[in-house]
Amino acid sequence: MVLGCSVIIHHEFFGEIERDFSTSIMTNTTRQFDTYVSRGVMLNNYANIFGLIMQMRQVANHPDLILKKHSEGGQNVLVCSICDEPAEGPIRSRCHHEFCRQCARDYMRSFESGSIVDCPRCHIPLAIDFEQPDIEQDEEVVKKNSIINRIRMEDWTSSTKIEMLVYDLYKLRSKKQTHKSIVFSQFTSMLQLVEWRLRRAGFNTVMLDGSMTPAQRQNSIHHFMNNVNVEVFLVSLKAGGVALNLTEASRVFIVDP
């Protein structure tokens, strides 16, 4: 039996601060892209263009995904050379740069078959062994470098997209029956901000991201599936695409553009 589903796309306007910041990012991106085109070097700067597109996706979620990338407290953790987020399922190239496993796959697949792919950091031909195990990271260091620990959260301002999510989840909660929801994002930092906001709005949440061990991931899934009080499961797109059968959830939210 095939059950019907509904896809709803919300369109909302930024507040003034978000709009000004996103406009500046878009203007800078357009200027750089036009420069590459006018000089005839667009294909030689594919990695830079990939990064510019990534920035535009991040600013649509929350300005802090860009503003707080390199703030104090963000050291000693592996950072992806493509998305500039803490690396999920971290792997290392032959030129000794770190990547999220999924980011590296997507990046290399974006090139035509047989073409030479340059490293986005050092611009030499990129070679990665995708069979290598994840680079081990200290769990406490990863937690310490969370974006939540790099922001004065008492002064923090939410974003239009996060507030839309909170509003939609509140509407589900107002019904008599319990609804479980999954929130997907490519950016771990976005999920951390969403988690912080939802918990302060009274929602019980659980998270699954690429920094977790297989046992930790399974425990998170079990907790979401079997605890009636947990309403929201925050899942990284880079970590949650394998062997997930979350039939308990009746709503899915994708927050990335």
Model-derived segments and their meaning:
Residues 11-12:
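Interdomain hinge/linker elements that couple catalytic modules in large macromolecular machines
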